Regions:
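Surface-exposed acidic/polar loop and edge beta-strand patches at domain peripheries
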Residues: 1-126, 134-163
């Protein structure tokens, strides 16, 4: 599902799949966000969790209270290819949420909740990440990050080299 926030300056769109930005368009119709091209990179602005980047051979060892567990983590983590739940929406703000599930627990043995809040004010988009460890007795290592890609060149009379 695609959800939009609009004001007098921008229209910003988001996808519940991945909980990510999918469009940033000015009132003049200029698209700022990369729209994806499978020839180069089909992504737009994925949310990376519980890792940013890759791990050696895709394999991670977790040192838990009850022993060592091995898991497989794909590049940039587990949530960028999952459906998020829309928890809140106003005319200028929305909040997505995702939690651990049986599939994520197989390779990342921590019960978590991730909330991503997007807020549009004027020409600014504020993104706030909130990560919750739902197990109080187990330390939960993680990274979280955004990976937005911006369109370049923006205008028809520009070249990539202009940037």
């Amino acid at each position: 599902m695609v959800i939009a926030l609009k004001n007098d300056d921008l229209e910003v769109q988001f996808k519940t799949f991945g909980g990510e930005l999918s469009s940033i368009r000015s009132k003049e119709g200029i698209e700022y966000l990369w729209q994806g091209d499978p020839e180069y990179w089909s992504g737009q602005a994925p949310v990376l969790f519980p890792i940013c980047g890759s791990v050696r051979n895709g394999q991670v060892q977790y040192h838990l209270k009850d022993g060592v567990k091995t898991g497989q983590l794909p590049r940039h983590g587990l949530i960028r290819k999952r459906e998020f739940e829309l928890k809140e929406q106003t005319d200028h703000r929305l909040v997505f949420e995702i939690t651990s599930n049986d599939e994520s627990l197989q390779n990342y043995p921590y019960h978590f909740r991730v909330e991503i809040a997007y807020e549009l004010k004027g020409k600014e988009i504020t993104i706030t990440y909130r990560v919750q460890n739902l197990e109080s007795d187990q330390v939960m290592p993680y990274f979280i990050g955004g990976h937005p890609a911006f369109r370049c060149p923006l205008l028809a009379d520009e070249d990539y080299e202009d940037y």
